[in-house]
UniProtKB/Swiss-Prot annotation:
Subcellular location: Cytoplasm
Full protein name: Probable transcriptional regulatory protein BH14810
Keyword annotations from UniProtKB, A to Z: Cytoplasm, DNA-binding, Transcription, Transcription regulation
KW Transcription (keyword) present: yes
Amino acid sequence: MAGHSQFKNIMHRKGRQDAMRSKIFSKLAREITVAAKQGSPDPAMNPRLRLAVQNAKAQSMPKDNIERAIKKASGSDVENYDEVRYEGYGPGGVAVIVEALTDNRNRTASNIRAAFTKSGGALGETGSVSFMFNRIGEIIYKPEAGTTDNIMDAAIEAGAEDVQSEETGHHIICTFEDIGEVSKMLEAKLGEAESIKTVWKATTLTPVDEEKALSILRLISTLEEDDDVQNVYANFDVSDEILAKLSA
């Protein structure tokens, strides 16, 4: 089982749902504000903002929160956020990419470096691991959104590149550049998605045992708890047997 979305599900079952939701909304609001500040405050005229709003809606973020985040961009006291990508190796040689929006690069770099070091890994230079990933668009629908055939037909018509239907939902893959248009066309056919985002998909996987999997889980959790961190991606591969143990 590749990636760490399954581990996110495990973490959410540990009784931290409310705290996680609050943090997710905070990160979504930051992305909306940055997108609105960089372009038009009208989602119809700003592709990045439109995608950010779509994703916020997919995460059930209240409409008032979304509008407040957009309005914040026009304020004179709004912080200036830099988009920064950090790369390094975690436990077991697992490649990790961290995306952040920060108003203090020194603080964020220090926190992320400390997290890597504590886990037994090491923060590297930009480009040190990203060659093992592809930048893609990923749109996720719940299982009840439609049959496999219906989802496939809608995805093909929208210009998607691949569809992976599982018990947990339908994962629709498209190019990084086309995610805005593809998600818009899918919404017209299938309704609002559960998740719309650009992701780093691993092309090279690193198998890990149970001990290393737990260490990676702790590293990812620590990174995602940082307010500046927007997304974390890792290229580990864990067996279904180990995943079942961690889910127990």
